């Protein structure tokens, strides 16, 4: 009986991991299709946050366009996504995302399309006024 319960628990744990946006994601530029960075999405106090782990062939490594405490700081290690709250089993909304290229902040929502594909939408005002990038899970 204990072995059965353990197997059930492990199965549920695996299912919840597969349905989570937590992990490392390869970002793809929606304008030219090139790989730009790896972003680590992590959970803290029930919300999702994202931090740049690695830049791929960077045009810039310092966020000169950023404002506030991010101004003139390295992009690697920088938090660029914050405050996303779960909205169903595969969506998170209500957060913000910052584009290090121009330093602008946008409202953000993300949707897990499958265990290795994440749609990240940044927008102003309404979700219709924005753009979506597709990120891919880094599988090591």
Language-model features: where?
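Central antiparallel beta-sheet cores of small beta-barrel/beta-sandwich binding domains
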Residues: 29, 34-99, 105-106, 140
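Short polar/acidic secondary-structure junctions
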Residues: 30-32, 100, 111, 125-126
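Sec/Tat signal peptide C-region and signal peptidase I cleavage site
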Residues: 14-20
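Edge beta-strand at a domain terminus
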Residues: 115-117, 124-140
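K/E-rich alpha-helical interaction surfaces of small helical-bundle regulatory domains
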Residues: 20-34, 133-140
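Positively charged n-region of N-terminal signal peptides that target proteins for export
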Residues: 1-5
């Amino acid at each position: 009986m204990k072995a059965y319960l353990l197997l059930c628990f492990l199965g549920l744990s695996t299912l919840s991991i597969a349905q989570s946006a937590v992990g490392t994601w390869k970002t793809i530029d929606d304008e030219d299709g090139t790989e730009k960075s790896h972003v680590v999405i992590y959970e803290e106090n029930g919300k999702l946050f994202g931090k740049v782990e690695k830049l791929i062939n960077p045009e810039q490594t310092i966020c000169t366009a950023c404002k506030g405490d991010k101004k003139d700081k390295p992009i690697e290690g920088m938090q660029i996504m914050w405050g996303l709250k779960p909205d169903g089993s595969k969506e998170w909304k209500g957060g913000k995302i910052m584009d290090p290229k121009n330093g602008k902040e946008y409202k953000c929502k993300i949707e897990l399309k499958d265990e290795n594909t994440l749609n990240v939408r940044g927008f102003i005002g309404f979700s219709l006024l924005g753009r979506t990038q597709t990120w891919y899970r880094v599988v090591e």
